[in-house]
Regions:
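Short beta-strand-to-loop junctions in surface cap/lid or active-site-entrance loops
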Residues: 1-11
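Short, proline-enriched alpha-helix->beta-strand connector loops that line the catalytic pocket
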Residues: 11-12, 147-153
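Serine-dependent carboxylesterase/thioesterase catalytic core
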Residues: 14-20, 25, 34-147
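Conserved strand-to-loop "acid loop" that flanks and positions the catalytic carboxylate
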Residues: 20, 155-159
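Short amphipathic alpha-helix
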Residues: 29-30
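Generic structural hydrophobic/aromatic packing signal, biased to beta-strands
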Residues: 141, 153-156
């Protein structure tokens, strides 16, 4: 599945980031609900390769999609679902996305890690390994939350 970008005159754009085993189709119902009310809308297809793609690499790809669709300076709102929320935070906190983001929504994302990532071998599934409790990536993200205080953040999680 390819990247999907729907445009209109209203701003700011909304970027939706899918999770580990998902595609942009996971947002079809949300897209229908937003029809006509929230555009431009960008839903990039990130090649997560069942967790083989490192999370930072996915965040770099996300940044490339955002820049290609909206340039370098257009403010955006960002919503990440599941692993997409962690990918979004990497882009925000480690790759400069905070400077252009107005709001960040994390839905069902393992921001503190998940035990389900433990059994997978790190050398093969580095993206999944990044989601382990206490991983170097999550420690780095959670060790410096000051930048997130400059934007409106919402986290929704259910266990």
């Amino acid at each position: 599945l390819g990247e999907e970008c729907v445009t209109s005159d209203s701003a700011p754009p909304l970027v939706l980031v899918h999770g580990l085993l998902d595609t942009p189709a996971v947002f079809n119902a949300l897209k229908r609900e937003l029809a006509g009310g929230r555009h431009p809308l960008l839903i990039p297809a990130l090649p997560l390769r069942l967790g083989r793609t490192p999370t930072m690499e996915a965040a770099e790809l996300l940044g490339g999609h955002i820049e290609a669709a909206f340039g370098r300076d257009q403010p955006i709102d960002l919503l990440g679902f599941s692993m997409g929320g962690v990918i979004g935070r990497c882009w925000l906190q480690l790759l400069g996305g905070l400077g252009r983001t107005r709001r960040f929504f994390s839905v069902g994302s393992p921001q503190q890690g998940t035990l389900t990532a433990r059994p997978w071998p790190s050398r093969v599934f580095s993206g999944i390994a990044d989601l382990r409790n206490g991983s170097a990536l999550l420690e780095r993200l959670n060790g410096d939350l000051d930048g997130l205080q400059r934007i409106e953040c919402h986290s929704f999680y259910s266990a």
